[in-house]
Regions:
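Glycine-rich Rossmann-fold phosphate-binding loop(s) that bind the pyrophosphate
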Residues: 157-158
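Residue-level detector of anion-binding/catalytic polar loops
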Residues: 24-25, 93, 115, 119, ...
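Short gly/ser/thr-rich secondary-structure transition/capping motifs
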Residues: 30-35, 53-54, 131-139, 181-188, ...
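Short beta-strand elements at the ligand-binding edges of bilobed clamshell
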Residues: 93-99, 188-191
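Rossmann-like adenosine-cofactor binding region
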Residues: 48, 58-62, 174, 180-216
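An N-terminal-biased, well-structured beta-alpha scaffold segment characteristic
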Residues: 1-95, 194-196
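Phosphate-binding beta-alpha-beta segment of Rossmann-like dinucleotide-binding domains, i.e.
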Residues: 98-151, 163-166
Length: 216
């Protein structure tokens, strides 16, 4: 008998196809809308695995609903939605994908910094409104600011923070960072010093009680 796997959010059909000989997949309908907690708790049957994009908070209520559960796979970097201590007690495997979005997130972060520094959003609107030839354009009007020589303060220096730093260095930026339990690096600064010194600040800390509402 095939094992039943619950997938709480859209997953590419071509990816699932190669596993259908061994598993039955329960997927959301419509597929592009994540399952609500109510929908998950309404499912009947022996579920042995859950593939989740971190929308579903997995707690005692969920685990009691699916007593045959053996593994929960988070398609995300974080595990904030999982009660890891409880899963360990119940001997249920928990996995995540810590490196899957590192480069994508770092690329987007660098793009946002460029958009801000070079005023690309404002310039784009200016051109699309056809103001370019009629509104007194002057050279340098949308130049913005150089990144070279500017200081980027990174809050949270894990895989993503380091990937952002590598990209920023290629633009000639100076890198400082703050991270819990690290204070010996010459680039380390306290949070207050980082906020005072930085020209740009990029936040990449995991969500914890300490980081919740860290910046307003």
């Amino acid at each position: 008998m095939k094992k039943k796997i619950l997938i709480t959010k859209h997953f590419p059909d071509e990816t699932l196809e190669s596993f259908k000989s061994s598993f039955d997949f329960l997927v959301p309908k419509p597929s592009f809308v994540p399952m609500s907690r109510f929908e998950v708790l309404s499912i009947k049957g022996k579920i042995e695995g859950i593939i989740n994009s971190a929308e579903l908070k997995v707690d005692n209520e969920i685990l009691n609903k699916f007593p045959s559960l053996k593994i929960i796979s988070n398609i995300s970097i974080g595990t904030d939605n999982l009660d890891l201590e409880l899963l360990s007690k119940k001997r249920i495997w928990a996995t995540n994908t810590p490196l899957s979005f590192v480069n994508s997130t770092a690329d987007c972060t660098m793009a946002f910094i460029l958009i801000l520094a070079r005023r690309l959003r404002q310039a784009d609107i200016y051109v699309r409104k056809n103001l370019w030839p009629n509104d007194g354009f002057t050279p340098g009007m949308w130049d913005g600011n150089l990144l070279s020589g500017k200081t980027l303060g990174i809050i949270g220096y894990g895989n993503i923070g380091k990937a952002v730093a590598r990209r920023a260095k290629s633009f000639g930026m100076k890198i400082i960072f703050t991270k819990k339990n690290i204070s010996r690096s010459k680039n380390y600064r306290s949070l207050n010093d980082l906020l005072r010194i930085s020209d740009f600040i990029s936040l990449h800390a995991p969500l914890t009680d300490d980081s919740y509402h860290l910046l307003n």
